Amino acid sequence: MRILLISSAYNGLTQRAHVELDALGHEVSITLALSPAEIAKAVALFEPELILCPFLREKIPADIWQHYTCIIIHPGIKGDRGPSSLDWAITDNVKDWGVTALQAIEEMDAGDIWASANFPMRSASKASIYRQEVTRTAITLMRDTVERVASGTFTPEPLDYAQDDVRGTLRPLMRQTDRSIGTATRL
C-alpha cells in the first residue's frame, strides 16, 4: 500500500512508523506539515492510498481529508480531544490512558475511530510515557488501521459520547499556569 506519513516533526514515533510500515512491505513517503501548500504538493506527487499522521499539530487541509483517507494518531483515550492530551492525563493523575486512530474531519480529534487501545499509566515523565507506552500503542494501532483500510470492509466507529467506553472530553491547550506547582506555604 502507498502510505504517506504527514508529521509536524520527524520525531521518534514518526521514525518508528516509517521503519515498521516499510518492513511490512508498504511504499512509504514522509512529508513535514510545514504548510497546507507543502502538504498538498506531497499528496499530489505521491498519490497515497492512505495518509497516516503519527505526530501532527496542524489541521489537514479540507481538500485533502475530503478526498483521501487521513488517519490521525491521537495520544488520548476515546473521546479525548485537544492538543495537550498526555499533559492533562499526567496532571490529572489518571490510572490509564490510551491512543486513538481517528479519521481527519473539520473538527479536530472528532472523527470516526479506526482503532483505540489503552495502557496503564505509570509515574514517569511525559517524554518517557510518550517514547514507551504511547509509541508502542500507536504502532500497534497503525498496523491495525492499515489492515482495516486494506480490507475495504471495515467501518470505523463514529465518536459517540453516549457510549460507555468513550470517557474523554475536549480539553484546552495546557498553559504554563496549568503546570505550575503551588509554592505558597503557611508558617
Model-derived features: positions:
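Short, structured active-site "lid" loops
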Residues: 43-60
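Structural motif
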Residues: 6-10, 33-34, 54-55, 185
